[in-house]
Amino acid sequence: YRTLTQDTTNLEFKGGNLGFIDKIKANVYRLNTKRDEVPNPNYELDGEVRTYGANLNLDSRLFDRHTLKYGVNWRTQKSSSNGENNEKKSDAGVYVEGIWDFSPVTLTTGLRYDRWKMKTSSNTENSDGNLNPSIGLVYDITPDFSINTSLNYATRSPRLYEAALMSSRSIISSPDLKAERSRNAEIGFNYHWNSALTLSGSYFHQQIKDVQAIRQAGQNYVWFNGGKLKNRGYELNAAYRWKGLTARAGVAYSKPKLNGDTADIVTTAIPMGRTWTTGLSYQFDNPNLEIGWRGRYVQNAGYAPTSRGSDVALNVVRAGYGVNDIFANWKPTGKDDLNVNFSVNNVFDKNYKPHSQRAGANSLPEPGRDVRLSVNYRF
């Protein structure tokens, strides 16, 4: 058996009206994740990851109609396996974002700089910095109908190796290892009718260069930039409200491809079947009680597995599934200070395997019927 423990400490401050600064939000945090496993003569899979970080986010109003957001982010990580073979990584970033109100058009512009440094268990070191711009536009054609579009660039620094497996492997990095760099373009719309009907939709196209991968070279495992990922998809949602009744429905689909093949790698994107969501709920005034039902239905998805843990077949078809949940939320005082929540997830005890796992046909099933009762009190 194994024991997984997570210890989190977070100190947060919120304030405002400090001269030019209208809003301020800052926090420092510590996260320690540890895995202890019963000793085995063939292997040791103990591991620990320590993370420290801080964030400072500021908002300033300009001319009573525009908003300027800016701040600093910092994080450092250290992982070890059985107390040895340490890996280290640090990330720091600064950003500025402007939200410009030129009614009926809202323009959003942003610029972010990220710097990272990493040291592997075999003492190979890499570091780099990236500048990422972004721009977005919302056009309110009428008070009820708007269209939007955006183009965003972002980077993700190389990740540390799995702490539990690090003790038995020599991990090095390619001398020219770079951060993954993504470009995401999106277009969408929002429509509201008479405070009853809401429709929204979007289409996106994403490209990620320098996808991080690992290969074996002799006695070493080498981090390197392994390819390019392309992903495109859409999402449509509808909601209708009448008195206390709310009905929802939606569909989402995406199609990732890595170098022309569908990706099955945990570090990139997971191919999932077209997903349909539904919901029906009713809100009573007295007592203050909401009851409802949620449904999630995923169509089957086929792909060619290319990563460890995948089925050996050349093509795998993940079966579709449907899951239903019921829930109730009661506020005895009629306010938000006291909440009693009851839910039954997977109410029909469906045996299914999710598409979000990177493994192929041999992935683990999701939990069966899950009954939960919770009471929350705020003061």
Which residues are covered by each model-predicted region?
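Face-selective signature of the C-terminal outer-membrane beta-barrel domain
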Residues: 4-148, 152, 197-203, 241, ...
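Gram-negative outer-membrane beta-barrel transporters
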Residues: 64, 107, 199-207, 224-307, ...
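Outer-membrane beta-barrel proteins
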Residues: 33-39, 77-83, 118-122, 156-162, ...
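Extracellular loop and loop/strand-boundary signature of outer-membrane beta-barrel proteins
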Residues: 1, 38-46, 57, 79-86, ...
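Conserved C-terminal beta-signal and adjacent last beta-strands/turns
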Residues: 149, 243, 268-379
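Outer-membrane beta-barrel pore domains and translocons
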Residues: 27-33, 73-77, 112-116, 152-154, ...
